[in-house]
C-alpha cells in the first residue's frame, strides 16, 4: 500500500491525519489476518521515524525519507514524489523479482507513485481516491483554500492508469464517472469499516465522568480535524441558539481559516458560550469511543465527506448523528432512523435539527434510536470491508494477467520473421 501524505500510524485528528489513516491501517491489519502480507509505504516526517515499523504480524510500515521532515505542506508534496518513488523502488529492488503482487495507492499523490511502480513491477494498480478536488472545490467552506488545478490533472492521470478503482460509496463512483470519465466496469465499492469491539454502547454517566463532563444535561460532540471543511464552527453557532446544550470538540488543527483550536476558542467567546464548550485534544481510538458514549448526539457538519467514518463509529456506540447531507454521509447515517441529515449549512436549520434529535433521544423513542444506530453500524464491519477489498484485488490481478497474455499473443502474431544475415568476414 502507498500512503504518501499521511502515515497510518499518525494520530487521527492532527494535521492531515483522519479517516484515511484509520482506513489504511485497519484494512492492512485485517488483510494480514487473512494471510495477506502488507507493506505500507509512507513519508517520514521526523528524523526519529525508524525506516521500518512492524505494526503486527504481516503488517510492515516503511517510512521513506522524501524531503524535509518538518515545514512541508501537503500542497508542496508533489515536489517530493520523485524522491518518494525512488525510496519505494529501492525497497522493492532489495527483494527477488515478483515480490509484490499488487499495489494499492491511497489519495492521488500515492496514485502517481503507484502508477510508476505498476509499470516497473508489472503488477496491477488499485487506487482509492478518498477525496476528489472537483468535489471539494464545489463545496468550499468560508476561508477554505481551493484545491489547485495540479491536483485535478494528477487525479485524472491516476484514474486513466489505474487497473481498478475502489470507492467508499455508489455516490463516489458516480462522481468518478462524471468528473473523470472512469470506466464503470473498473470500479468497486468497499465501505470503510468500524471496529465493533472498540466502538460499542457504554454507560453514559461513566463516560462523562471519565471526561470530566457534567453528568446531566445535553452533550453534543464534534470529533475531527479543526478546519473549515469539517465545519466545527457550525456546531458552535448552532449551540449559541440552544442554551441547554453543552458542546465537546475533540480534534487538532489542520488546513486554513478557522484551523486552530484558538480560532474556535475565540468564536466560542464571541458567541458567549465559552462556559458550555469543552475542548479536547485528538483522542486515541479507545478514548474516542468514550467521547461518543458520553454524547447525546454527534454532529458531522462537513462540507464534503467521501464517507464519514466518525458517524458510523458514533452509531456503533448507540449515539445518534446529525450530519450534513453530502458525499457518503447519507450512506453512513439512516435519515430519520439513526439520526438526521441536514441539507446546507444554515445555522438555524442546524440548531433546529440538533434540538429535534435531542428531544427524540430523550423521549420514549430513545432506546429504539440507539438500537437502530448499533444495528446500522454493524453492517460496516472491517470483515465486510476486507471481503470487498479482496474481491477487487482478485479482479485486478485476473484482468491484469489476461491483458498481459493478450498483448503477448498479439505481439507474437504481428511480429515478422527475423532474418539472419551473415556478414563477410565473420566466422560460421
Swiss-Prot record:
UDP-N-acetyl-alpha-D-glucosamine binds at residues 11-12, 19, 225, 230, 283, 305, 313. 1D-myo-inositol 3-phosphate binds at residues 5, 16-21, 74, 107, 131, 151. SUPFAM superfamilies: UDP-Glycosyltransferase/glycogen phosphorylase (SSF53756). Keywords: Glycosyltransferase, Magnesium, Metal-binding, Transferase. It holds the Pfam family Glyco_trans_4_4. Mg(2+) binds at residues 292-293, 295, 319. Gene3D superfamilies: Glycogen Phosphorylase B. HAMAP family: MshA (MF_01695). This is D-inositol 3-phosphate glycosyltransferase. The gene is mshA.
Amino acid at each position: 500500500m502507498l500512503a504518501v501524505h499521511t502515515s497510518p500510524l499518525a494520530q487521527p485528528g492532527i494535521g492531515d491525519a483522519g479517516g484515511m489513516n484509520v482506513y489504511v491501517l485497519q484494512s492492512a491489519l485485517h488483510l494480514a489476518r487473512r494471510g495477506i502480507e502488507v507493506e505500507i509505504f509512507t513519508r517520514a516526517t521526523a528524523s526519529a521515524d525508524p525506516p521500518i515499523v512492524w505494526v503486527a504480524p504481516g503488517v510492515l510500515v516503511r517510512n521513506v525519507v522524501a524531503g524535509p521532515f518538518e515545514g512541508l505542506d501537503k500542497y508542496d508534496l508533489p515536489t517530493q514524489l520523485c524522491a518518494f518513488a525512488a525510496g519505494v523502488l529501492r525497497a522493492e529492488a532489495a527483494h527477488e523479482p515478483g515480490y509484490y503482487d499488487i499495489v494499492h495507492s491511497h489519495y492521488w499523490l500515492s496514485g502517481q507513485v503507484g502508477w510508476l511502480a505498476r509499470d516497473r513491477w508489472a503488477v496491477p494498480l488499485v487506487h482509492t481516491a478518498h477525496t476528489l478536488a472537483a468535489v471539494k472545490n464545489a463545496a468550499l467552506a468560508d476561508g477554505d483554500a481551493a484545491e489547485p488545478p495540479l491536483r485535478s490533472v494528477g487525479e485524472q492521470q491516476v484514474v486513466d492508469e489505474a487497473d481498478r478503482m475502489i470507492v467508499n460509496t455508489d455516490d463516489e463512483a458516480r462522481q468518478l464517472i462524471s468528473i473523470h470519465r472512469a470506466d464503470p466496469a473498473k470500479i468497486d465499492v468497499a465501505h470503510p469499516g468500524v471496529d465493533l469491539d472498540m466502538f460499542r454502547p457504554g454507560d453514559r454517566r461513566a463516560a462523562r465522568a471519565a471526561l470530566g463532563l457534567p453528568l446531566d444535561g445535553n452533550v453534543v460532540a464534534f470529533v475531527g480535524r479543526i478546519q473549515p471543511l469539517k465545519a466545527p464552527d457550525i456546531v458552535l453557532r448552532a449551540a449559541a441558539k440552544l442554551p441547554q446544550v453543552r458542546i465537546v470538540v475533540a480534534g487538532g488543527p489542520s488546513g486554513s481559516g478557522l484551523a486552530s483550536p484558538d480560532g474556535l476558542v475565540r468564536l466560542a467567546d464571541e458567541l458567549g458560550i465559552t462556559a458550555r464548550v469543552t475542548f479536547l485534544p485528538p483522542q486515541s481510538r479507545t478514548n474516542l469511543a468514550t467521547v461518543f458514549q458520553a454524547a447525546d448526539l454527534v454532529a458531522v457538519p462537513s462540507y464534503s465527506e467521501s464517507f464519514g467514518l466518525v458517524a458510523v463509529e458514533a452509531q456503533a456506540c448507540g449515539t445518534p448523528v446529525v450530519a450534513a447531507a453530502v458525499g457518503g454521509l447519507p450512506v453512513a447515517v439512516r435519515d430519520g432512523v439513526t439520526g438526521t441529515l441536514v441539507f446546507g449549512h444554515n445555522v438555524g436549520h442546524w440548531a433546529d435539527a440538533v434540538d429535534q434529535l435531542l428531544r427524540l433521544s430523550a423521549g420514549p423513542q430513545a432506546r429504539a434510536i440507539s438500537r437502530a444506530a448499533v444495528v446500522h453500524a454493524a453492517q460496516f464491519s472491517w470483515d465486510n470491508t476486507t471481503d470487498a477489498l479482496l474481491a477487487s484485488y482478485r479482479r485486478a490481478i485476473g484482468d491484469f494477467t489476461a491483458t498481459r497474455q493478450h498483448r503477448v499473443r498479439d505481439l507474437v502474431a504481428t511480429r515478422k520473421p527475423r532474418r539472419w544475415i551473415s556478414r563477410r568476414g565473420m566466422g560460421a
